[in-house]
């Protein structure tokens, strides 16, 4: 479904341990799943407000890394109630029949310093397709509740 291309994933994750690889759980306060779609002669922007996910990240060997996300399809928000209702309908996400969207990585490849390609399976409306998501590693640092990483 071209509707989600390009999908922009921005996430910050709380670090549970210092050993590699490290699994980061989504911190929804500092994370977002947003999209930008061409509509007629303009762009429509939106986001999903309810999601969960994790990234297993190995900075020394990114091939050992993985990503998983689950998104509640009914949480779509474009700041237009009529459009949101249409997107939730059978015409698009059919949220009553398909309450979640998901992504599960198959492979993570380094594209150079702080750049990754994450190849995986995106499932929308029960249809699974291979997609590649470009990811930028923003860094790892100290946060108010311990170590955090940004992607």
Question: Where do the model's predicted regions map?
Answer:
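Sec-dependent signal peptide recognition
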Residues: 2-9
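N-terminal signal peptide c-region/cleavage motif recognized by signal peptidases
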Residues: 14-16
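Low-complexity, acidic/polar, glycine-enriched regions of mature
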Residues: 18-151
